């Protein structure tokens, strides 16, 4: 057991540079590579792509494909600005400016809509807070009324018990 441990330690120490051992007064942690201590080789079978389809996965349009296939896909999702064709008499820079103006208008419209939504939501929140306050006052009033009725009922029951005894 000790010879095996010593050989494992010597193998792992042999992978450590000698410069770490030259300064004996400084104790540094030594990195041990676990792959050097015990090497495992696991051979996993490689399944062809079609065999996974027979296991129950679908091979419809949601199946994975390589980047060359996805770039040629007809229903490809495009991101970013829509690219318009440049006519012969048009300048590419003027088209870019047109795109920027278009998206700036859309962005400003979206921001205006968000601001309007925030204002309406703020007003609605204030209205709901007022309703909650009114409902809480109504609940406290009903609780007081209920407590008064309970008090009267308990007094009447006590009077009734006193009269019967």
Curated annotation (Swiss-Prot):
Residues 104-150 form a coiled coil. The gene is zip-10. One of its GO terms (molecular function) is core promoter sequence-specific DNA binding. Transmembrane segments: none annotated. Keywords: Activator, Coiled coil, DNA-binding, Nucleus, Transcription, Transcription regulation. Residues 53-71 have a biased composition (Low complexity). This is Transcription factor zip-10. One of its GO terms (biological process) is innate immune response. It comes from the Eukaryota. Residues 53-99 are annotated as: Disordered. Induction: Negatively regulated by the microRNA mir-60. Induced in response to thermal stress in conditions where severe cold temperatures are followed by warmer temperatures. Disruption phenotype: RNAi-mediated knockdown reduces the lifespan extension phenotype of the mir-60 loss of function mutant. Its main location: nucleus.
